[in-house]
Structures are given as structure tokens and as C-alpha cells.
């Protein structure tokens, strides 16, 4: 949703828009004036969705039995709802991809990559690895009557190295949480996690 001053969802004044003009449309109430100060919205924020239950079931079935019609059925139910072609075979990479696109902007990615032990491979600190680089989508409105894009919003992807010069680096020690000393003192069977 573009909310810039000249965007299609123009705010009432320039104090009510963000710097880029972008908001994530997912779970956003687009009713006019829904976000106005002093008014509320009836849009609920989901904590757990049916798609999450399907993806958990697909992953568990795949881990227990390998690629089965059961796990494929769960994935294809989500793909059908989204209007995407069904898969004929299932790999672990398909499950990773489905989680990434289904839960985009919902805060699942970090935890998924930790659970699958993939975070250190994807965010490996290599400046040549696109997955380890921060990128941004930059919009601008073309105002040139001689241009074919006149009056249209154009977007380009920009590498954010001038703002965030270092690539994302997830180290093995980041997989482990820390036990509080009180827990360790109260239970002699608990041992500290590595890197703690």
C-alpha cells in the first residue's frame, strides 16, 4: 500500500505518512480513515492461522515419512488457496520456500531458519551472498509527460550497503539460548548451553 503524500492512499496530512510511503498490506485495514488518530479499526491481527497448522503438519509428515501424499496435500491446500499451481513432488526446500512466502512480514523467518539449522548458511556474512545483504525497495512517482511511465509509481531494488555496510552473519553460538543462573542452581541436571 503506497501512503505517500501523492500516493493512491493519500493520508489526511503529511504527518500521517511514513518516510518511504510503504506499508505492508497484509492484515492492514484499508477502510478510509481506519487509521486516523482517535478512530479504531475492526481488523484483527492473527496469532495463529490455518496455513500455519497446514505447514506444521506438512513439515512433521515430511520429517517422519519423507515426501508423502499427506505432506504434499497440506502444501497444495495452501497453494490452491493462494491461486498457485500445485506441486507434484515435495522436497524440504519446497517446505522452506512455502514458509518464507506464506509468512512474509509476520516474524516467522528468524525462528524457522534457526529451527532448521539453516540460519548460519543463509546469513553467512559473505558480502557476495545476496541473502546476507540488506536490500530495500525504493519507490518514486514519474513526473515527465514525455515518459511512458508518466504518472506511474516505479520501484527499484537498492542494496543498502551504505547504511548497513556489513552483511548479515549468524554464528553457530546464536542457535543456543541462555539459561538463567537461577534455573541452573535449582536444577543440578541442567547444564549450560554451549557458548553461554
Residue ranges of each PLM-predicted region?
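Extended, hydrophobic/aromatic-rich amphipathic alpha-helical segments that build helical scaffolds
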Residues: 44-78, 93-102
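Long, intrinsically disordered, low-complexity segments
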Residues: 37-40, 45-47, 79, 87-196
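General helical structural elements
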Residues: 16, 23, 29-30, 53, ...
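Flexible, polar/acidic helix-loop-strand segments at domain edges
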Residues: 1-49
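Charged alpha-helical initiation segments
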Residues: 19-32, 70-73, 80-83, 100
Amino acid at each position: 500500500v503506497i501512503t505517500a503524500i501523492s500516493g493512491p492512499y493519500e493520508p489526511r496530512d503529511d504527518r500521517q505518512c511514513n518516510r518511504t510511503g510503504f506499508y505492508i498490506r497484509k492484515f492492514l485495514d484499508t477502510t478510509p480513515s481506519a487509521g486516523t488518530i482517535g478512530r479504531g479499526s475492526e481488523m484483527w491481527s492473527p496469532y495463529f492461522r490455518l496455513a500455519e497448522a497446514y505447514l506444521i503438519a506438512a513439515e512433521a509428515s515430511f520429517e517422519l515419512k519423507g515426501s508423502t501424499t499427506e505432506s504434499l496435500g497440506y502444501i497444495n491446500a495452501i497453494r490452491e488457496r493462494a491461486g498457485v499451481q500445485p506441486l507434484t513432488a515435495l522436497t524440504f526446500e519446497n517446505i522452506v520456500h512455502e514458509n518464507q512466502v506464506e509468512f512474509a512480514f509476520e516474524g516467522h523467518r528468524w525462528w524457522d531458519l534457526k529451527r532448521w539449522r539453516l540460519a548460519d548458511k543463509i546469513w553467512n556474512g559473505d558480502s557476495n551472498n545476496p541473502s546476507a545483504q540488506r536490500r530495500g525497495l525504493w519507490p518514486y512517482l514519474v513526473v515527465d509527460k514525455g515518459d511512458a511511465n508518466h504518472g506511474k509509481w516505479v520501484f527499484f531494488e537498492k542494496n543498502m550497503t551504505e547504511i548497513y555496510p556489513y552483511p548479515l552473519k549468524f554464528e553457530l553460538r546464536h542457535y543456543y539460548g541462555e539459561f538463567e543462573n537461577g534455573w541452573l542452581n535449582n536444577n543440578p541436571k541442567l547444564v549450560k548451553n554451549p557458548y553461554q
